[in-house]
């Protein structure tokens, strides 16, 4: 539980491995699910960027079905990135109800693990060009300047796999 001035919020961590082994989502006040790159408004985070595509795809399948599916389906999934502004709601917000994502997203709703893994492996394409730089920044190996940060963060989301 956190207090900011007069505002209090309850934050609960949910391990959501798949995009990366340490991926963690945050449930905030029982209303929002900050998913980082685990799942997006449409699609999932790529499980291949660490070179362990099939095992991480299996982790992601179990994240969806064993960790996210039991949560309140009214939670609003708020990912770290978006692929297109068309994913925004009428008020411009980039979120989607968890239940809608689980039931209607063509990838997230796949109920068979082998089908899911095969689909993911067969549809990934090449990793994003900037991934090497992103990894070096995340590990503290390089210190990005403002221009590099803008390029890495503002560019289109290439860490997602959508149907």
Describe these PLM feature segments.
Residues 1-79, 85, 162-163:
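Catalytic core of the metallo-beta-lactamase
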Residues 62-163:
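Accessory terminal helices/loops
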């Amino acid at each position: 539980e956190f207090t900011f001035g007069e505002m209090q919020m309850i934050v609960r961590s949910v391990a959501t491995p798949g995009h990366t082994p340490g991926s963690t989502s945050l449930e905030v006040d029982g209303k929002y699910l900050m998913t980082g790159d685990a799942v997006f408004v449409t699609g999932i985070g790529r499980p291949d960027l660490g070179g362990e595509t099939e095992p991480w795809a299996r982790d992601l399948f179990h994240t969806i079905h064993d960790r996210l599916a039991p949560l309140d389906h009214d939670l609003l999934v708020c990912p770290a990135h978006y692929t297109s502004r068309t994913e925004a709601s009428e008020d411009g917000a980039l979120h989607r109800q968890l239940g809608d994502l689980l039931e209607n997203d063509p990838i997230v709703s796949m109920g068979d693990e082998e089908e899911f893994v095969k689909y993911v492996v067969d549809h990934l394409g090449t990793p994003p060009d900037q991934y090497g730089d992103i990894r070096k920044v995340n590990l503290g190996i390089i210190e990005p300047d403002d221009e590099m940060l803008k390029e890495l963060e503002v560019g289109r989301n290439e860490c997602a796999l959508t149907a």
